[in-house]
Amino acid sequence: MDIPPIESGAGMKIAVCAKVVPEQARRIDPETKRLDRSGEQTLNPFDANAVEEALRLKGDDAGAEVVLVSLGPERSLDALRKALAMGADRVVLVADEAAAGSDLVASSYALAQVLEREGADLILFGQQANDSDGAVMWAAVADRLRRPLISQVAELTVSDGTLRGKRQTEFGYDVIEAPLPVAVAVSDAINEPRYPSLKGIMGAKKKPQQTLSLSDLGVDADRAGEAGSRTEVYAIGEPPPRGETQRIDDDGTGAEKIVEFLLERKAL
Ligand SMILES: Cc1cc2nc3c(=O)[nH]c(=O)nc-3n(C[C@H](O)[C@H](O)[C@H](O)COP(=O)(O)OP(=O)(O)OC[C@H]3O[C@@H](n4cnc5c(N)ncnc54)[C@H](O)[C@@H]3O)c2cc1C
């Protein structure tokens, strides 16, 4: 089923939940049993799709606003500026030492508080964060806000206060409508995020960038960080070895050796 083209952002306030993630390969710190988040950081690539979609919805509507909402350390602002350079209007970052070690339960609570305060018509999420790959945060936040949620959205339109999303499924597409305010997790197939222009990059630093503490949001210390988390990591380790393996180096006779190997085991 084809979805009609976008009508207009019509003064919509769009919040985009954007996570800042490590740029390099992931490593678990054996001391803290948490992801090592030192080193260079970048905007979660899946969230660039959500930013792009928000900018497309906003279009030329000067009355519409795209606000980035993020939970992470203060230095996340550097990476979030990429989304400002793409065209987002402002950033609200929840940065607080007490939030370190927050699991899904604590993170979704803090994000829901800031989103409640923003009161956006539409909350966009990426499909997943590429550091933890949970693909669950949107469900947890929507549940806390008691908002309808559509996930894996590959096309979306907003018209007359109703959002219509074409959702990718294993067997085809679902088309789902929901009244605003609504939460949507976009699929990475929805668009091709733009590159920030030089003008965008130059202008990004001047855009409003607000940092909030947990107390600014009225989040009690026992609902944040490890105290507010329900997950406990007991141990980390390497995956178990796969049993007996045989390595075949291809010196030109690799195919023959594989056939021989399979014949011996009566697999051919
Ligand atoms: C014991 C424990 C300790 C942890 N400590 C930390 C920690 O100190 N710091 C940390 O970052 N994570 C920490 N995590 C991981 C954290 O729980 C996950 O980041 C969280 O559950 C979200 O899952 P995800 O990152 O897989 O996001 P997904 O569910 O894959 O994210 C989906 C979408 O939600 C949005 N989103 C997700 N996270 C954020 C965010 N922070 N800000 C804005 N939008 C977001 C984005 O749009 C993203 O595309 C910890 C996990 C455990 C189990």
State each model region's role:
Residues D2-L268:
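N-terminal glycine-rich FAD/FM-binding segment characteristic of electron-transfer flavoproteins
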